[in-house]
Amino acid sequence: MASPALKNTAGFSLIELLAALVIVALLLALAVPAYRGHIVRAKRVQGQATLLKLMQQQERYYSQNNTYLAFSAGSDDAQGQQFQWWSGEEGEDGAARSAYEIDASACPEMAIKQCVLLRARPGTTRVDAQFQDADCGTLTLRSTGERGSSGPAARCWL
């Protein structure tokens, strides 16, 4: 008696499916960290751009008033509120979607008339608390032109 012939069936074998899953897992293992790194760098650049914009505003204020102006997120005075204390876009929820909280104060051991220090702190409670920049930490910009950061990375400002 002859055995019936096996029919050709369409589909994937278990081995083929597992091989495809391994390839997808490898691609994700490489792509996700690179994507996260890109997001951190993009938000860092946004914070730097905001610091530069605010320093330009400070210089304009200095040329009119012969002093710089200290401000923070909790500034009550009208003059302090003219400066944007968050990085990113203006608008109703701009601060909540921002990565950095920005403040201005006198440079250490100097009067506010002589030097202003802008600080951009990542992931505070007033902005996106989930954002952290382990490489650069807090970004700083002085009216003397000095740029800095609190993190271990040497090249935070390019």
Task: Annotate the PLM regions.
Residues 12, 35-38, 61-62, 68, ...:
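Aromatic side chains
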Residues 9, 41-45, 49, 111, ...:
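Residues at secondary-structure transition points
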Residues 1-38:
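N-terminal single-pass transmembrane signal-anchor helix
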Residues 24-28, 51-52, 58, 73-76:
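Alpha-helical interaction segments
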Residues 40-67:
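Membrane-proximal N-terminal amphipathic helix
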